[in-house]
Amino acid sequence: IMTIGDWEYYEKSKNKDVEKINKIVGKIILINQDTKKFKILSMGHRNPQGLFYDSINNLIFSTEHGPQGGDEININTSPDSKIIKNYGWGKSSYGEHYGYPDNKNLDLYAIAPLNKSHKEYGFLEPIKYFTPSIAISQIVKTEKFTNEKYKHIIYVGALGYPSQISEGDMSIHQIFIDKKINIKKHNIIPINERIRDMIYVKELNKIILYLETSGSIGILQSIN
């Protein structure tokens, strides 16, 4: 499974390839390692950052950067689905254009209105969005760190800035999700480092962190 972002400003793009089903820009794809062929799983993505495949529940969890705000957490279709989901970029976003408002760019805003709803315009809503942005990064999933019984427990990293730690930057977000894909609880664990990457090591029951600020490796583990 691979993510591909929108490699240029949507509103300034001549081709709008994010919206085209025959283009891989702004998509999440599944690659067959034997045949080298791929299929599109979802579209309408701006800048996917984190990706985790839950093989037990056959679900794809992903994160992506919004523009100025509007970072997203999405639960994607299973790789077996024949339905291509559309998350709406650049028609819908909970972020804003950089420099908005700017009267010189009114025509560009019309091309990419960044509507503050996905569902109303025929797209899928993120299960969580962040405004202001937390500079979202990797996502991992494990239910082994806590005795609380939830269907899904995810851990989401954030880059960002020291001045915005109180808003969730430079932290790990522990999010509890029920069977109906409703968020029931959200804990923020300040790390005071830009968290670039994370990986869950099942054999150790630990999450290994790549901390970009100091260029070091961190370990997140349960103390229960």
Where are these regions (language model features)?
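Blade-level signature of beta-propeller repeat domains, shared across WD40, Kelch, NHL, RCC1
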Residues: 199-224
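Beta-propeller domain segments
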Residues: 6-185, 216
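Conserved blade-ending motifs and adjacent loop-strand segments that build the rim/top face
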Residues: 181-202
